[in-house]
Amino acid sequence: MLINFTQVLQDSWNFFRNQKKIMLQFVAILFIVQSASALLSFSVNDENKNDVLNLANTDITSFIFSVAITQILTSFIAAWGLTSIHKISLQNYRTLGETFSLTLRRFAGVILLDLLMVAPMLLGLGEAFAALLTKKSPSIMSLIAMLVGVWFFVRLNLTVVHYLSTQEALSQTIRKIWMRGNTRKGVLFIYTLLVYFLVPILIFQLSAFSNNAVFDMVIGIFTALLNIFMLVVTYRFYSLFMKD
């Protein structure tokens, strides 16, 4: 089945408008988490502002901890949103509390799938970063690892949606999405480019114009709204992707 991305975006927007109460609840939740994360990061940076030239004295542990907590919370909100969208699409949605419980039960698997998707890419990036720190040129192997990692990510980035939308085990989920993607690599690449490259670039460009608290808040709300909308796009694309 051919996938028309213009139609996917239009259908996703119609869904967002029709379910705006629930969607805006998720926008609010994500905005609160992002704002709390920004305040926490600012606090860590402020404490270490006198150590900019002495990275050895910077509290790296606190920074990594705050980033990890933020990432876990963001991943959970995304999984919660996808579960809710799935239930609404099946006309089986009741409350946010119900989908929260369903997401919580499957969240350990979501974390494992997320790690599996990014691990090869992170290995390549880690090796390249280590080479730069030692003032050496990154090896060919690190470049190959990054390219393989990107390819691996493209092939598996729908596993989380499938895992949350079904009761299948992790191994079944990976196998099904991998096999399904054997003949649909092109549309997978376009989807990945849209969701994981173009949207983040747009958000980054908007953030670059930030110069006051009010504008920061507007950008934060828009970012949260765009991220929740992209969850709808993801689910809609996944639904078409899995059709014969």
Curated annotation (Swiss-Prot):
Q: Where are the transmembrane segments?
A: 22-42, 63-83, 110-130, 140-160, 186-206, 213-233
Provide the Gene Ontology terms for cellular component: plasma membrane
Give the species: Haemophilus influenzae (strain ATCC 51907 / DSM 11121 / KW20 / Rd)
In terms of superkingdom, the source organism counts as Bacteria
Subcellular localization is given as:
Cell membrane
Under which name does UniProt file this protein?
Uncharacterized protein HI_0825
The answer, when asked if DNA repair is one of the entry's keywords, is no
Q: Give the main localization category.
A: membrane
Which keywords does the record carry? Cell membrane, Membrane, Transmembrane, Transmembrane helix
Q: How does it sit in the membrane?
A: Multi-pass membrane protein
